[in-house]
Amino acid sequence: MKLIDTTIAVDHLRGEPAAAVLLAELINNGEEIAASELVRFELLAGVRESELAALEAFFSAVVWTLVTEDIARIGGRLARRYRSSHRGIDDVDYLIAATAIVVDADLLTTNVRHFPMFPDLQPPY
């Protein structure tokens, strides 16, 4: 399973060719594409009215994960561990990282500096 963060979703929705290729390859390879409900929140918070239909179509293609107690607890631990040394990481990113850990998914993001808890993380494009 691949867990996408908001950067991948935004790139895809904005027509970034590399994001479209990445998601198409994952689908063609039978890979499950998941995202945290927090990604849905961030996308809905920033969408223009003219983009709502495309956003809803995107939503239907993704498996959505809820924020569970385990995710909240692990996210809290990650925030305590990294907040003082990695300023600028918001709480949503800690919870997305915790989601990847709990559901045992590979995190896909272009914003690797917000995920120091995954030292080998590289942007997918």
Curated annotation (Swiss-Prot):
Induction is noted as: Up-regulated 2.3-fold 7 days after infection of human macrophages.
Read off the Pfam families from this record: PIN
Q: Where, in this chain's numbering, is Mg(2+) bound?
A: D5, D93
Q: Where in the cell is it found?
A: Secreted
Q: Which EC main class describes this enzyme? A: hydrolase
GO molecular function per UniProt: magnesium ion binding; RNA endonuclease activity
- Give start and end of each PINc domain: 3-122
Does this entry carry the keyword Magnesium? yes
State if Transcription regulation is listed as a keyword.
Answer: no
The record's EC number reads 3.1.-.-
Q: Which InterPro entries match?
A: PIN-like_dom_sf (IPR029060), PIN_dom (IPR002716), Type_II_TA_system_RNase (IPR050556), VapC_family (IPR022907)
The record's GO CC annotations read:
extracellular region
The protein's job, in short, is:
Toxic component of a type II toxin-antitoxin (TA) system. An RNase. Upon expression in M.smegmatis inhibits colony formation. Its toxic effect is neutralized by coexpression with cognate antitoxin VapB19.
Quote the protein name from its UniProt record: Ribonuclease VapC19
